[in-house]
């Protein structure tokens, strides 16, 4: 039976939800009803809280299951990154730290304890409201006193300590089974032993050339690191101060990677050490992960090469064009033209790069590499070093062409050069008074480049001695503009008159970023 409403009664017809799509009309009616509910009750905080809670409970059913999971994951992630306010009470700081690490916490006779089963135990001794000692235990290993953690808390660096603890816990994937993690921990001890034995030389040359780089052992709050690259320019700068070995202030400057273990869908073999040496004899649903300290700019060709010897595809941060990415430009419409900034009176190089070489976005910036077999480690290191050299050679051209802000307009004499970029080779062609010349740069070994100078039309070698000289200069500096000054001079060519600066915009914001001024963090 349907009752007939009185003429003065307003009837709201609420649409029944038929699907999970957002219904604006329904939400609007709900808001109107909520206003009526609040007006009918005393407006005090308790009543207001009850009304809001009731409203939220009604709305909760409109979120689908996937949406709820996304929301919960988002909240959990935000909790791990929430800052810990230094001015909060001790109990509040302990609570926030524990929650952000996914731990339980409790008060003890000495202070506080934070615990996550099988992963972490942190015991704090507190006197007069200040932390006096911090004792740590990771992955059920023996507990130890951490001077660094104690110092950080005494300086009020609660958030920084939490972040470093969180990074340590990433060593073993939380999805690993107990048995797999135990096998991974054994493999980690073997890796530490192996690298501790074969990478003891901290010299920059050894870091750059050794098959194992240099291993910096794990400490209280940092995983072990393998440093694998020290570019010639960096070594030259340090040598001016008579420094030839890795220093503490180099730890965050030079590229490195850390070992960790990630869950894998299928069993992989892990290294084990016995009296006969090490062998890959243990199986686990886990894979050795080489976590790079910063994004690594990788061409598509090299990524495929890495994939052939990896347990799975390297983790890609984003896809890009490696050569355009280094310039700092999101998009380049026309041919890229740059001119060197050599000293006054010197002949400049005017580089022209075909825009088509800067458009393909099949390259990538990667963050992690997954080892299939430990014996392939040295091959992966060689691939990374050669790739770093290739990208640095291109960076050297951009760096040499950086136009400083406030440059007055003037005309310079320059040699016009066309640049062709591929992963296999970098080709630079230009005309001289005697013949058209082509300079071809290719990899010849680990962190070694080979330069061939040939006739651009016939392909005949100009002179073997020139090739040797240019190869040596390029490997000493990793600088193509510097190398080219030994290949050609202004008197050998018909020079063009170029008006500079080439760009009318502020080069500090839109121009190519110099490699050594901005660093190589991707």
Curated annotation (Swiss-Prot):
Coiled coil feature spans: 13-40
Transcription as UniProt keyword: yes
Location(s), subcellular: Nucleus
Entry keywords, A to Z: Activator, Coiled coil, Nucleus, Transcription, Transcription regulation
One GO CC term, this protein: nucleus
Keyword Nucleus: yes
Segments crossing the lipid bilayer: none
Complex and partners: Component of the Mediator complex.
Membership in a protein family: Belongs to the Mediator complex subunit 1 family.
Role noted for this protein: Component of the Mediator complex, a coactivator involved in the regulated transcription of nearly all RNA polymerase II-dependent genes. Mediator functions as a bridge to convey information from gene-specific regulatory proteins to the basal RNA polymerase II transcription machinery. Mediator is recruited to promoters by direct interactions with regulatory proteins and serves as a scaffold for the assembly of a functional preinitiation complex with RNA polymerase II and the general transcription factors.
Protein name: Mediator of RNA polymerase II transcription subunit 1.2
Organism: Caenorhabditis elegans
Gene behind the chain: mdt-1.2
């Amino acid at each position: 039976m349907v009752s007939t409403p009185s003429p003065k009664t307003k009837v709201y017809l609420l649409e029944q939800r038929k699907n999970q799509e957002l219904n604006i009309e329904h939400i609007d009616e709900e808001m109107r009803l909520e206003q009526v509910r609040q007006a009918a009750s005393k407006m005090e905080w308790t009543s207001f809280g009850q009304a809001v809670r009731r409203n939220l409970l009604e709305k909760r059913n409109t979120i689908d299951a996937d949406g709820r999971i996304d929301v919960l994951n988002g909240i959990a992630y935000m909790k791990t990154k929430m800052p810990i306010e230094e001015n909060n009470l001790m109990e509040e700081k302990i609570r926030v730290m524990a929650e952000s690490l996914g731990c339980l916490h409790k008060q003890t006779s000495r202070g506080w304890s934070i615990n996550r089963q099988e992963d972490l135990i942190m015991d704090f001794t507190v006197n007069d409201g200040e932390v006096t000692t911090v004792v740590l235990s990771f992955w059920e290993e023996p507990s130890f006193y951490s001077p660094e953690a104690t110092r950080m808390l005494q300086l009020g660096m609660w958030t920084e300590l939490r972040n470093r603890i969180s990074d340590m816990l990433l060593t073993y994937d939380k999805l690993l089974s107990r048995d797999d993690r135990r096998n991974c921990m054994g493999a980690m001890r073997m890796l530490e032993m192996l690298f501790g034995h074969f990478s003891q030389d901290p010299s920059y040359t050894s870091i750059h050339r050794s098959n194992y780089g240099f291993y910096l052992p794990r400490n209280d709050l940092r995983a072990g690191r393998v440093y694998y690259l020290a570019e010639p320019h960096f070594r030259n700068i340090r040598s001016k101060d008579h420094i030839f070995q890795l220093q503490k202030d180099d730890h965050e400057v030079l590229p490195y990677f850390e070992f960790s273990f990630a869950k894998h869908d299928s069993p992989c073999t892990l290294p084990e050490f016995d009296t006969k040496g090490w062998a890959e004899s243990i199986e686990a649903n886990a894979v050795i992960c080489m976590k790079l300290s910063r994004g690594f700019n990788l061409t598509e060709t090299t990524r495929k090469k890495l994939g052939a010897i990896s347990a799975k595809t390297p983790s890609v941060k984003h896809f890009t064009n490696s050569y355009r990415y280094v310039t700092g430009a999101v998009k380049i419409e026309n041919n890229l033209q740059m001119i060197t900034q050599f000293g006054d009176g010197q002949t400049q190089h005017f580089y022209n790069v075909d825009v088509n070489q800067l458009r393909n976005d099949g390259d990538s910036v990667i963050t992690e590499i997954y080892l299939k077999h430990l014996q392939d480690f040295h091959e992966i290191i060689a691939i990374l070093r050669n790739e770093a050299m290739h990208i640095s050679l291109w960076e050297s051209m951009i760096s040499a062409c950086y136009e400083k802000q406030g440059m007055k307009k003037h005309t310079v004499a320059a040699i016009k050069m066309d640049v062709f970029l591929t992963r296999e080779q970098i080709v630079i062609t230009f005309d001289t008074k005697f013949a058209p010349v082509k300079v071809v740069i290719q990899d010849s070994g680990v962190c070694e480049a080979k330069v061939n100078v040939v006739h651009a039309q016939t392909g005949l070698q100009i002179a073997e001695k020139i090739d040797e000289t240019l190869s040596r200069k390029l490997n000493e500096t990793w600088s193509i503009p510097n190398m080219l000054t030994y290949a050609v001079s202004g008197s050998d060519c018909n020079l063009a008159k170029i008006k500079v600066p080439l760009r009318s915009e502020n080069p500090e914001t839109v121009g190519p970023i110099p490699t050594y001024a901005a660093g190589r963090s991707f």
